[in-house]
Regions:
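Short aromatic-glycine-(Arg/Gly/Cys) micro-motifs in beta-strand/loop hairpins
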Residues: 1-15
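Short, mixed-charge low-complexity intrinsically disordered segments
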Residues: 16-17, 34-60
Length: 60
């Protein structure tokens, strides 16, 4: 089974721009840097039926 991780990506205004799903957690930080974002949270998910792109303020 392949583990999937979902990350919320934030721009400099701290708004969520998109969600990135990757198969390996250790690729996450590099991907986020490549895309020019400065913050992310990763969460393992066991299955995905679908996901929506959200734009909302970051909650601390």
């Amino acid at each position: 089974m392949v583990k999937l991780f979902i990350a919320q990506l934030y721009d400099r205004r701290d708004y969520v721009k998109t969600m990135l799903i990757v198969a390996e957690e250790n690729r996450l930080q590099d991907k986020v840097r490549e895309m020019g974002y400065n913050y992310c949270t990763a969460q393992e998910i066991s299955e995905i039926d679908g996901y929506e792109i959200e734009v909302r303020p970051k909650i601390n």
